[in-house]
Amino acid sequence: VSATANDGVAVSANNQTYIYLVKPLAAVPDSKKGDVRTLCFVEVNDENILNCGEYVMKESGKPFFDVVSIFAANINVDSESGRVHIHCNDQVSFLLKNADKFIRPLQAKGIKVNMSILGNHDEAGMGNLSQAAAADFAKELKAFVDIYGLDGIDFDDEYTVYKENPSPGFEQRSRENYCRLISECRKVMPDKLLGIYEYKSNFEDSPSGTVDGKSIGELVDYMCYGTYQRYVKGRESNFTGLPKSKYGPYSLKINEEYKGGWTSFKEETIQDLKDAGYGLQVFYNPKPQL
């Protein structure tokens, strides 16, 4: 028995007849609040993503968070076949198997739910896939998104073991290779969200360049600077064609702020971000009691 994904429906390949159980969904409310999109990464080993649905705007009652990203599934390589694939730990697998309980309630409020893809201590990474491997992995990501009813993918190029002498199917790490992966994802997921988390001073963990006439700034929906509690303006210029409206220069860990562990949460900084034309504010790991 094998499963295939077709337009978001999982079917068994050995069946001769299919019975589809259709569950009607209510219209998704409009959660748009302004020009700044809010994104929250949730480390699901520690926190419940449903916490994000409890944060609402005081006056309108709309959800505070526009996008919630499950952190994280992994990119890994099969040691026998050499094929790159998605790996989920027990916590992520539990969420996906119980999507009606954990994911759909957020989506019903108008919140987009993405999956973060993170390196996992082997050679598989965003910056070293060959053309064929990038296209193949993009198709697997699409099937994954369709089967579990997700709204997009966020990429975080950490923890990959890049090699000076790449194995078959891999190339030397480059920002252009990373851009090619995003291009392949955009081809098969034209209507899904694609985001990038970056933080290194040399920018090697982020894509840049142009593929088939499209710059990385055109291919992604947003990128964010992931060094928490630091506000750095101007980094967007290091990503080909990326406008300020798609960049988040300031990420905040909500729990530390709530406990008084940081002093950098300032209203004037958030206001300056908006006034400067940036279009993304990033948060991490909200607690339920706020």
Q: How would you name each of these model-derived features?
A:
Residues 1-290:
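Secreted glycan hydrolases and related glycan-binding modules that recognize and/or cleave
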